[in-house]
Each structure stands twice: as structure tokens, then as C-alpha cells.
Design a protein with these regions (language model features):
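Gram-negative outer-membrane beta-barrel proteins
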Residues: 24-26, 45-47, 67-73, 112-118, ...
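Short loop/turn motifs that connect adjacent beta-strands in outer-membrane beta-barrel proteins
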Residues: 8-13, 45-58, 96-103, 155-164, ...
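Transmembrane beta-barrel strands of outer-membrane/channel proteins
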Residues: 14-22, 59-67, 106-112, 166-174, ...
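Outer membrane beta-barrel transmembrane domains
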Residues: 13, 25-26, 72, 189-290
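Residues on the lipid-exposed face of transmembrane beta-strands in outer-membrane beta-barrel proteins
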Residues: 37-43, 89-95, 108, 148-154, ...
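Residues that define the transmembrane beta-barrel architecture of outer-membrane proteins
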Residues: 31-37, 57, 83-87, 102, ...
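Long, hydrophobic/aromatic-enriched structural stretches that serve as scaffold segments
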Residues: 53-119
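Short glycine/proline- and aromatic-enriched beta-strand/turn motifs that initiate or cap beta-hairpins
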Residues: 8-49, 54-58, 63-75, 223-233
Length: 290
């Protein structure tokens, strides 16, 4: 974990970031990386529109819920992945040195029935009158995985109102991988803002606002990862995890005088060899003030 230096100034809340992701607002097929919600609270002495030059001044406290599921919750298929209910709690610091934007942090990823996610999922099926799931008994068992994540990127301007940001990311813990990719933004969405990244989709979401330029912004991105290990697959299972993962994403953000709306789509490549198809997730964030 990165050592956090003492900061003389009092910390205040600089902003909140959140993103809801579900395949119900993507391809609508309710399977695999089926849903997640991330909530970030960012604290620091102040936000001036740019990252500080050292770690520890700006801290992000992150909570994330994720459901990973086989395609059929009622009839177990040995050639499909196991159910995963994951709750992660962590702290990350964001800073910039020599033009390189850095994010380093640690999360405790809690999995298994102890999270209560599968119970909540079952209750939702009861409420909607759907068949009772039978795959929860074979879900990834109770455990806690300490997960270190580091991302390094550089924002490069493309004219007056666009930017491109190549990045590299390394993660070790619940899943161990190295990822390279990039994001392009057309419009004012990311201008002087503290941008965070959702781990499942790679979609970027805003925590500390910058100029809040009114109008539409368009985001495009993609990345590829080399996967070394994943605690979400068991060696005894009949499926084979892929060692390469690909993602493509696009999003649109509207900023009004007081309100804002974001909607994005993410294409995910296959995560195990027996997976019959890719999937598309939808992500949404609403901040409405009247």
C-alpha cells in the first residue's frame, strides 16, 4: 500500500462519483458480468482542476458491488461459470508527476454468501415471481482477497475540445492482470475533472467536477488485458479461463445548468473458452436537480 503523507490542510469532501452497470440496459440477456454499482467519495484539501504532485493528498474511498452469474440461474451448466457475489471496499490515491496521472490503491474484495448478494438476488426473484435460482450453492465460497490496483496514464489534447488518454493498468489479487488501452473524449465532460475508472467496464466516471461545461460529450475507449489468475474460476471446473480479455466502450454525457446524465455501452470479449458469445453492458449515471 502507498504510504500516505501527512497533510496540514483539513480534508473536505471534493465530490462523489457513482456508476450503475447492468446488462438489462445493454444486450438485455442477464448473464456473466451481469451487474455492478460503484460509489466513490473523494476527499482532500481542495480541488483546483488538476491532480496534486504527490500521493496521499487526494483520497478516494470506494465501495463496489458486483454480480457475476451463469447464463441460467435455474439449471446448472458445468460448462458455464460459477456465480459470484462480490463486495469491495477500498482506498485509492490520485496524483500526477511529470505529466503522468497515477492512481494507486487497495481494495478488500469480499466474496461468497457472506456478502448477502445471492440472498438479495433470490429475494428479487421471489418478488418478481421468477423461478428460484439453484446455482447459489455452487457459488465462489466465502473469502476475502486483498487487491492492489495501479493505473498510469497521460492526457493529450486533440484540438480545442477533445483529448486522448492512453493508459496502463496492473492489478493483483481477486484477479491478476496487466491491461493497456486508451480513451478519447470529445466535449467538456473530463475538463479539469477528477475522473475514475469502473473496473468491470473501463468506463470513466466523474468524481470531482471541473468546469461543468454545458452540452454533450462523447467518449470512446478500448483496452486489452493479459490475465494471469482469477479467483472467480476454480481449477477443478470444466471450463478454461481465457488469458486475454478485450473491451470496447462508448458513452454520451449531457451536462445541463444543474443536472447531468451519462449513458454508456461496453462490449466485453469472452472470459472463458466455453463462453458461447460476447456480451454488452449498459452503464448509467443520473444527477438530477430541479
Amino acid at each position: 500500500m502507498v504510504a500516505v503523507p501527512a497533510v496540514a490542510q483539513e480534508r473536505v469532501t471534493l465530490g462523489w462519483g457513482r456508476l450503475l452497470t447492468n446488462d438489462a440496459i445493454g444486450d438485455g440477456k442477464d448473464r456473466w458480468r451481469t451487474g455492478s454499482y460503484v460509489l466513490s467519495r473523494v476527499r482532500g484539501p481542495n480541488w483546483s482542476g488538476s491532480l496534486p504532485g504527490r500521493p496521499g493528498e487526494i483520497l478516494e474511498f470506494r465501495m463496489r458491488l458486483e454480480t457475476i452469474a451463469p447464463a441460467d440461474l435455474v439449471v446448472a451448466n458445468p460448462l458455464d461459470r460459477r456465480y459470484v457475489g462480490a463486495l469491495s471496499l477500498g482506498m485509492h490515491t490520485h496524483f500526477e508527476t511529470a505529466g503522468v496521472e497515477s492512481s494507486i490503491g487497495m481494495d478488500a474484495v469480499i466474496v461468497g454468501p457472506q456478502t448477502g448478494i445471492s440472498s438479495l438476488h433470490g429475494d428479487l426473484h421471489d418478488l418478481l415471481g421468477l423461478p428460484d435460482p439453484t446455482v447459489f450453492g455452487g457459488q465462489i465460497a466465502d473469502d476475502v482477497f486483498l487487491t492492489l490496483t495501479a493505473e498510469f496514464g497521460r492526457t493529450l489534447p486533440l484540438g480545442a475540445n477533445a483529448q486522448v488518454r492512453p493508459f496502463i493498468e496492473a492489478q493483483a489479487g481477486a484477479e491478476t492482470l496487466v491491461r493497456v488501452g486508451g480513451d478519447m473524449t470529445f466535449g467538456g465532460f473530463a475538463t479539469e475533472a477528477l475522473m475514475l475508472r469502473d473496473s468491470a467496464t473501463g468506463q470513466r466516471y466523474r468524481a470531482a467536477a471541473g468546469d461543468r461545461v454545458e452540452g454533450l460529450s462523447v467518449m470512446l475507449g478500448g483496452d486489452i488485458a493479459k490475465v494471469y489468475d482469477s479467483e472467480y474460476f476454480l481449477a477443478t471446473d470444466a471450463i478454461t479461463p481465457t488469458d486475454t480479455r478485450r473491451r470496447l466502450r462508448a458513452g454520451m454525457h449531457w451536462q445541463g445548468a444543474q443536472s447531468e446524465v451519462f449513458y454508456g455501452l461496453t462490449w466485453l470479449g469472452k472470459e472463458f473458452e466455453e463462453q458461447p458469445d460476447e456480451q454488452v453492458l449498459g452503464s448509467i449515471n443520473l444527477r438530477l436537480q430541479f
